[in-house]
Every structure is written in C-alpha cells, then in structure tokens.
C-alpha cells in the first residue's frame, strides 16, 4: 500500500469546497495487485519493466487476508486527516469492488474473492470522515481501450470510433456503479493526459456525477475542468496562484 499525504491549500469562494479547505490533510491510499510484489502500480507493465502476463500473475497473490478496514480508518482518523481517497481502479483496470462490468476485479479475479472497497467505504462513513474515490480514466487492460503499453496501441479514436464508444459505455457503467453504491464526497480522476476533454466526454462525466451529488468535488484531472489543482511529485515552495 502506498500512502500519500495531501495538503489542501485552496482559497475558493464556492460553499461546497469549504470543507476541503478546512480539512488540510488527506490520506491517499494506493492499493491493488501491484502491492503483492511491491512494484510500480500499472506503470511497471505499461513501460515494459515487467510483462503484462507476469504483472497479472499478482492476482493469485492478492489475498487481502490481513485486511482490516476498520483499523485502516482508525489510523487515518488518528492522523488528524478529515478525509481519505482510495484507488477504486488504477490504470491497470483492476477494480477493488464487485463490478458487473469488465472482467478484472478483486471479487471475481483475485485470490481474495472479496469486494474490498465496500467495507472500507462503510468504515470511513461510520467514522465521520469524508470519502474520495480515485478513478483512472485509462484502462490499459480493457480490450476496447486505445492503449495497452507504451509500445502497443490498439487503435486510434479517429479510425475506430465504434471501439471508443464501447469503452465509453464501460467507463460510464463503472462510474455509475461507484456513484450509486458509494456516493463519494470527492472524485479524484487521473490519466486525462491520454486523450482530449471531448474524447473523454468530460462534461457528461461531470453532469452525471453531479446529478447524484450536487455537492461532489472534482480534482483537476479532467483536462483542467475540476474544482482544484493536484500537483504531483513535489510540494510547491510557494502557494500556487492557481487553485490548489
């Protein structure tokens, strides 16, 4: 599990984001099959440091046998954090919940045979913390997504719009599942750099998720169409002029 500490340094007027300005500290949890061998999440096979087949062998080691979401949330709360974000699905396409869409999730495809996201969400809400869900826009495992590895591209959207349409339906099905089942306070998207805003259909994404929760917050990784910025790799020395 890779845990990151996120400092909130925003100064926004919108009422819905007041809580995140006051929260200051977030615990962002990366958890997936990459935890089995302790290798880079998704990028290890995308950049071909390891073969895709070897990467997926980690499914057999993902047992979640020592998983105790209540202990996790207790530790998060003791840290002083007021909200937490967890990877519902990273770029490798491995979903932590029992998704009815796609063919790669912890319940159906891993040794654990568990939906590991639901008990974590329940523990977060029971303890009065705000919930954020990380969701990768790219899905490098899905057969109708454009990219598989840095050297393997399945197709171009312009040449095969019908395949992109299939992927879009799959993506929206999964977003609907997460929205309906967990109703997060924050959506933490990632991977927007692979395609343009209109290709991702960012406005539709936001409209659908806001219909479920008008007060939900979006990070900036919807091609800049979010409520706050999320720099990566380092913490700025000076407060950014943009929303952060």
Predicted regions and their residues:
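Mature catalytic domains of secreted/periplasmic carbohydrate-active enzymes
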Residues: 7-244
